[in-house]
């Protein structure tokens, strides 16, 4: 555990408790003693960047954080500050009271069309602001969609995937969790586009309605192969009674070719 409870970081942020452990970071609840508000601190794992890659990672990490901080939208988790603690880079963000979409998926398995479209609509609204600011998320998945205590979407981790994937040579571990949502052009050409974010949203919506992702496989390589070489099955194959307009909307979001998807969120 990097930051014990009660520890004060940079003479300002007092750690209250650990919220979550992820592959690339540990997240803590903390209090910004200068402003007297609760914040979330994401401390990046040091093994992500060692030696000569370290400087590159730090520069990219701070650049991505600056980009994310420039996006103003109620559906995006605000970034307040960045810094270094014990040789580890950290991000200070708005603290969201609530759960992530993955937690909700585990609780209720499938969602109504109305609820799915509401969550998708709010996610697209947040992404539209980001894309206008020139920021692509690259890693949209249920774990990065937070639902606050009023049930509204707040997207987290903008640009972190970019900073991390370029710092780790073996990004296969990262791929595993994310492969189910990655757009074909991202897999084939490492090409991050706004339309790639839309594809990920489409897969997520498919999963919310069907209770499972459209493609499954025993390993990430096979899974990635399917995203590149197969069309996402029509949602009506999993949910026969679904509205034709909704099915057509999902088909556009999850089109294999970038140019067949909507041009913007």
For each predicted feature, which ranges?
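Activation segment signature within eukaryotic-like protein kinase domains
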Residues: 119-120
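Conserved short submotifs of the Hanks-type protein kinase catalytic core
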Residues: 86-100, 104
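Protein kinase catalytic-loop region centered on the HRD/HxD motif
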Residues: 123-135
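Activation-segment/catalytic-loop signature of the eukaryotic protein kinase fold
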Residues: 82
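C-terminal lobe helix-coil module of Hanks-type protein kinase domains
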Residues: 180-265
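Protein kinase glycine-rich loop
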Residues: 15-23, 27
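AlphaC helix of the eukaryotic protein kinase fold
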Residues: 45-70
């Amino acid at each position: 555990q990097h930051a014990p409870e009660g520890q004060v970081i940079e003479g300002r942020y007092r750690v209250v408790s650990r919220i979550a452990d992820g592959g690339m970071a540990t997240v803590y609840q903390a209090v910004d003693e200068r402003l007297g508000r609760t914040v979330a601190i994401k401390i990046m794992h040091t093994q992500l960047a060692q030696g000569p890659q370290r400087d590159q990672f730090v520069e990219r990490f701070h650049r991505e954080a600056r980009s994310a901080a420039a996006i103003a939208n109620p559906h995006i988790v605000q970034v307040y500050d960045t810094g270094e603690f014990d040789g580890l880079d950290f991000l200070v963000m708005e603290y969201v009271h609530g759960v992530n979409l993955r937690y909700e998926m585990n609780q209720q398995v499938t969602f109504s069309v109305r609820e799915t479209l509401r969550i998708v609509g709010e996610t697209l609204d947040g992404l539209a602001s980001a894309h206008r600011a020139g920021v692509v998320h690259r890693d949209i998945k249920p774990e990065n969609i937070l639902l606050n205590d009023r049930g509204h979407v707040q997207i987290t981790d903008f640009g972190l995937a970019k900073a991390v994937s370029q710092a780790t040579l073996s990004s296969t571990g990262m791929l595993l969790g994310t492969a189910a949502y990655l757009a074909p052009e991202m897999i084939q050409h490492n090409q991050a586009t706004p339309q790639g974010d839309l594809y990920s949203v489409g897969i997520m919506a498919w999963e919310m309605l069907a209770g499972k992702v459209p493609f499954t496989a025993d390993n990430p390589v096979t899974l990635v192969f399917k995203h590149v070489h197969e069309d996402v099955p029509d949602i009506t194959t999993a949910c026969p009674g679904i509205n034709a307009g909704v099915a057509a909307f999902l088909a556009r979001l999850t089109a294999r070719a970038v140019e067949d998807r909507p041009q913007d969120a």
